[in-house]
């Protein structure tokens, strides 16, 4: 981890062991997986920057209502932590067989050290700035009978020194990667996103963005932006038909100078807009169990396939397949190259 000037922290713990450590794991597969470009993906170097989180799950049984208030009582039987936000994007990049590097901000706390430890275990090179003035962003979910009953969020906006440290890390790493992925969850790590995109452009590294908010001007100069249906409506308003969507999408793409704009549309599939026009694929999910983290998987798949040299339409088809797989899993999950067959 990168510790901010003047900070004291626990060295040698799980977080310290992960600093700058790790490398791609599980990339020694021979041949291709029924068309998935395993060899090319193994050479892909993907840098993920953005809002790093820890997703914490408490699983238990519900067999009574509390006498104190009309709420269920969960008898917790198991706890599980998973990488979330930008860290989940990096986890998916590594699971697909590419070389994943993660830059972000964590707190000087147990969740932050666990993020670093989980990243190392996943084969991710984690370069994390430590901000002792804020907690690591943590989303805690309580589940009973495989259903989510409650979510509790712990989060604060990072300070300027932490953002300065993030800039230093990004500057050092961008040029040695094939693609930069920006995972924006509006938690503050990408407050200076315009400058980050400009640095990547100067280095000749394409930028893929999972956006937040309704002002997409801050993403001007990226190669690809991937809003979901709701986010696209925030940005351009509701559309009455496919023709109106295409008109507004192409106008937005032109205003931002994007190579491509991909709208993910849940059960309606995905629609890609480029200079060549409109391309669409239908959704592939057979059963939707949990959509949390699905956008992370889609973004990671787009990044590794694009870095491997695939054209946008083909990258979209692989991303659609990955998204259809991951929504059938509980919680923030990954898709591997083997599952893409």
Outline where the language-model segments fall.
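Positively charged, low-complexity intrinsically disordered leader regions
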Residues: 2, 23-63
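Compositionally biased, low-complexity flexible segments
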Residues: 5-27
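Substrate-binding N-lobe of the ribokinase-like
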Residues: 30-38, 44-45, 67, 71-138
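Active-site metal-binding loops of divalent metal-dependent hydrolases
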Residues: 52, 185, 297
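Conserved phosphate-binding/catalytic loop of the ribokinase/pfkB sugar-kinase fold
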Residues: 128-134, 139-176
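Short acidic, glycine-rich surface-loop motifs adjacent to enzyme active sites
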Residues: 177-189
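Conserved phosphate/ATP/ADP-binding segment of small-molecule kinases
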Residues: 187-278
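Conserved post-catalytic alpha-helical subdomain immediately downstream of the catalytic base
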Residues: 259-260, 284-341
């Amino acid at each position: 981890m990168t510790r901010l000037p003047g900070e004291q922290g626990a060295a040698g713990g799980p977080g310290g062991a992960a600093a700058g450590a790790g490398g791609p794991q599980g990339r020694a597969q021979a041949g291709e997986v029924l068309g998935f470009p395993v060899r090319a993906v193994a050479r892909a170097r993907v840098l993920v920057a953005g809002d790093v989180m820890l997703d914490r799950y408490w699983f238990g049984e519900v067999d009574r209502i509390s006498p104190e208030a009309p709420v269920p009582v969960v008898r917790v039987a198991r706890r599980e932590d998973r990488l979330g936000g930008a860290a989940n994007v990096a986890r998916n990049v590594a699971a697909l067989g590419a070389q994943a590097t993660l830059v972000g901000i964590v707190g000087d706390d147990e969740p932050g050290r666990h993020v670093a430890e989980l990243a190392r275990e996943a084969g991710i090179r984690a370069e994390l700035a430590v901000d002792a003035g804020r907690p690591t962003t943590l989303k805690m979910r309580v589940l009973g009978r495989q259903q989510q009953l409650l979510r509790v969020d712990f989060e604060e906006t990072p300070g300027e020194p932490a953002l300065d440290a993030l800039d230093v890390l990004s500057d050092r790493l961008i040029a040695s990667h094939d693609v930069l992925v920006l995972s924006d969850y509006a938690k503050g790590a990408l407050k200076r996103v315009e400058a980050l995109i400009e640095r990547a452009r100067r280095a000749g590294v394409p930028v893929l963005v999972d956006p937040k908010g309704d002002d997409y001007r801050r993403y001007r100069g990226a190669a690809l932006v991937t809003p979901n249906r709701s986010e696209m409506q925030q940005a351009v308003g509701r559309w009455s038909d496919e023709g109106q969507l295409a008109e507004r999408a192409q106008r937005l793409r032109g205003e931002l100078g994007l190579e491509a704009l991909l709208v993910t549309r849940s059960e309606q599939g995905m629609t890609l807009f480029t200079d060549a026009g409109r391309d669409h694929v239908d959704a592939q999910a057979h059963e939707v169990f949990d959509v949390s983290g699905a956008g992370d998987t889609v973004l990671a798949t787009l990044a590794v396939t694009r870095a491997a040299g695939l054209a946008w339409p083909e990258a979209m088809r692989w991303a659609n397949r990955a998204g259809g797989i991951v929504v059938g899993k509980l919680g923030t999950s990954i898709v591997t190259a083997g599952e893409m067959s």
